[in-house]
Curated annotation (Swiss-Prot):
EC number(s) reported in the record: 3.5.1.88
CC cofactor note: Binds 1 Fe(2+) ion.
Originating organism: Thermodesulfovibrio yellowstonii (strain ATCC 51303 / DSM 11347 / YP87)
Active-site residues, as the UniProt record annotates them: 136
Catalytic activity: N-terminal N-formyl-L-methionyl-[peptide] + H2O = N-terminal L-methionyl-[peptide] + formate
GO MF term (any one): metal ion binding
Descriptive protein name: Peptide deformylase
Record NCBIfam families: pept_deformyl, PRK00150.1-3
Cofactor(s) recorded in Swiss-Prot or TrEMBL: Fe(2+)
InterPro entries per record: Peptide_deformylase (IPR023635), Peptide_deformylase_sf (IPR036821)
Gene responsible for this protein: def
Keyword Ion transport recorded: no
Amino acid sequence: MAILEIKKYPDEVLKKKAETISEINGDLQKLIDNMIETMYNANGIGLAAPQVGVLKRLIVVDTSPREQNQSLIVLINPEITDSEGEILSEEGCLSLPGFTTRLKRKERVIVKGLDRNGKEIEIEATGLLARALQHEIDHLDGILLIDKISPLKRELFRKKFKTKK
């Protein structure tokens, strides 16, 4: 396994829509293993393939405390099929180091996709897991945390991190 480079804003790959995965093969399994290792190495709770420069619809998520048994989720071609409620909470991103913001997300989501073996799975999530799944699925559509904040906050972000529009 290898630790991959996490792409940082404003890398253009982060703004592109990821492609549906049509074949589960050895290369994909290696990518999954490398993404898992990369996420844990960065002390993250989720990672999407575009964050490591791969435009494929693949996410890995683990919101369990590090000292407990890990509850790793690997989702291929995930999609949110149902959601309800709203909750405002603090959120950060491995591709936006040093930046956090309060953001409204759905409080409960149902996500369908394939596990790493190609088996269909459905996850009903609330709390931090629901937030992490929504965040990582946003990455698959080229949507970043800063795309969901107010124009004023976005301008302050750009000034602080010295990026252009």
